[in-house]
């Protein structure tokens, strides 16, 4: 999926994550994370965001995530929503997304 514009999903409420996805001219994926549980779960959160981007076939993006204790399913859902908004895609391939949970 080609990231065309900056988009945001989520909130700064407790148990949520606000994620911002922007185009990256360097043709790489960069993830910046701000989390109160970064020492415990930072690597896992980054890996989950990165894997979700790979599953969505994103090859270049700047991602900024502010975590407030979100569960994995919330992190994945917010990432999916932000990527679709940033790519200008309004149709979700639910069958493909469901296949990730095998």
From Swiss-Prot:
Keyword Protein biosynthesis found: no
SS bond partners: none
Alphabetical UniProt keywords: Cytoplasm, Phosphoprotein
Annotated positions of the O-(phosphoribosyl dephospho-coenzyme A)serine modification: 14
Xref: Pfam families: ACP
InterPro entries to which the protein is assigned, alphabetical: CitD, Mal_deCO2ase/Cit_lyase_ACP
Any single GO CC term annotated in Swiss-Prot or TrEMBL for this entry: cytoplasm
Chain segments annotated as coiled-coil in the UniProt record: none
Compartment(s): Cytoplasm
Lineage: superkingdom: Bacteria
Function: Covalent carrier of the coenzyme of citrate lyase.
Assembly notes: Oligomer with a subunit composition of (alpha,beta,gamma)6.
Entry's family note: Belongs to the CitD family.
HAMAP family reported in the protein's UniProt record: CitD
Name used for this protein in its record: Citrate lyase acyl carrier protein
Source species: Streptococcus pyogenes serotype M18 (strain MGAS8232)
């Amino acid at each position: 999926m080609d990231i065309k514009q900056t988009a945001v999903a989520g909130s700064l409420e407790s148990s949520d994550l606000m994620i911002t996805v922007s185009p990256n001219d360097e043709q790489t994926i960069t993830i910046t994370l701000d989390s109160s549980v970064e020492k415990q779960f930072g690597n896992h959160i980054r890996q989950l965001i990165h894997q979700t981007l790979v599953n969505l076939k994103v090859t270049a993006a700047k991602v900024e995530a502010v975590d407030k204790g979100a569960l994995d399913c919330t992190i994945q859902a917010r990432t999916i929503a932000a990527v679709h908004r940033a790519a200008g895609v309004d149709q979700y391939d639910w069958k493909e997304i469901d296949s990730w949970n095998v």
